[in-house]
């Protein structure tokens, strides 16, 4: 399947969304009429969503921080006892400034923002960045999650370049979750991988990503990996936290303090 943006069209799900669909098409440089399109970026009541166009296609993928899995995890996810919280160094009185350099659909960044961290997110793929931007805009308009969304700042572009030319105070913690060839086998993740892999592929530049992160982060770098996957080539992690399906490799530089 081609990853070319020429095989993506933008379409409104109702006439009332035609103007917004036109704005997205112009912003992303995508057509609104394309009979041979393999994907549709759809605009509707629930916001922006990406739909694979084939007979047995799974449902659309969108970013939703207000309802569904994100809301459930926000309410019942285990708070600062979650492994990701321990990995980035959240402790009583410590909420590090985090850069999520491989944002994807923003789930991990949202968890960290829910726990009180200021999080910058980098996403290099324009379609995924658009979904993320739309999800953050809807979250900002919701009374329950607006304060969380306000702690999240989206940056679009190549993470290595953005880190190498970072301006301002460096993040204390940089979080990386590179796309890996063999990932979580849950139905939701399978659906998302089927949609996104044609666009993003595997992160073959993960070693360069880690190197740039280690240069920029002031306190630590955290890399999420499938539990049995090897560490990224290059510097060795100082220690790891292991869960049922994932592992967090921690590269400490300096102790986080309140």
Swiss-Prot record:
The gene is rsmJ. Disulfide bonds: none annotated. Pfam families: SAM_MT (PF04445). S-adenosyl-L-methionine binds at residues 107-108, 123-124, 177. It catalyses: guanosine(1516) in 16S rRNA + S-adenosyl-L-methionine = N(2)-methylguanosine(1516) in 16S rRNA + S-adenosyl-L-homocysteine + H(+). The keyword Transferase applies. It is an enzyme of class 2 (transferase). Belongs to the methyltransferase superfamily. RsmJ family. The lineage of its organism: Bacteria, Pseudomonadati, Pseudomonadota, Gammaproteobacteria, Pseudomonadales. One of its GO terms (molecular function) is rRNA (guanine-N2-)-methyltransferase activity. Keywords: Cytoplasm, Methyltransferase, rRNA processing, S-adenosyl-L-methionine, Transferase. Gene3D superfamilies: Vaccinia Virus protein VP39. PANTHER family: RIBOSOMAL RNA SMALL SUBUNIT METHYLTRANSFERASE J. Its EC number is 2.1.1.242. This is Ribosomal RNA small subunit methyltransferase J. InterPro entries: 16SrRNA_methylTrfase_J, SAM-dependent_MTases_sf. Specifically methylates the guanosine in position 1516 of 16S rRNA. GO terms for cellular component: cytoplasm. It comes from the Bacteria.
């Amino acid at each position: 399947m081609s990853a070319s943006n020429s095989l993506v069209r933008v379409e409104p799900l109702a006439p009332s969304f035609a103007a917004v669909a036109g704005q997205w098409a112009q912003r992303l440089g995508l057509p609104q009429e394309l009979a041979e399109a393999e994907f549709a970026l759809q605009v509707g009541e629930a916001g922006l969503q990406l739909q694979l166009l084939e007979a047995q296609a799974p449902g659309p993928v969108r970013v939703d921080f207000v309802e569904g899995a994100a809301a459930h995890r926000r309410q019942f996810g285990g708070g600062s006892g979650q492994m990701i919280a321990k990995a980035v160094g959240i402790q009583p009185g410590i909420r590090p400034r985090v850069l999520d350099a491989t944002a994807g659909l923003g789930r991990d960044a949202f968890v960290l923002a829910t726990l009180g961290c200021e999080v910058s997110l980098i996403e290099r793929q324009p379609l995924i960045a658009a979904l993320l931007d739309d999800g953050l805009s809807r979250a900002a308009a919701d009374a329950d999650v607006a304060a969380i969304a306000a702690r999240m700042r989206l940056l679009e572009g190549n993470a290595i370049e953005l880190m190498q030319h970072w301006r301002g105070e460096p993040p204390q913690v940089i979080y990386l979750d590179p796309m890996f060839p063999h990932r979580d086998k849950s139905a939701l993740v399978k659906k998302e991988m089927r949609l996104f892999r044609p666009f993003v592929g595997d992160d073959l530049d993960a070693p360069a990503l880690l190197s740039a992160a280690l240069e920029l982060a002031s306190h630590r770098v955290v890399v999420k990996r499938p539990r049995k996957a090897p560490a990224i080539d290059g510097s060795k992690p100082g220690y790891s936290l292991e869960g049922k399906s994932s592992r967090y490799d921690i590269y400490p530089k300096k102790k986080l303090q309140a």
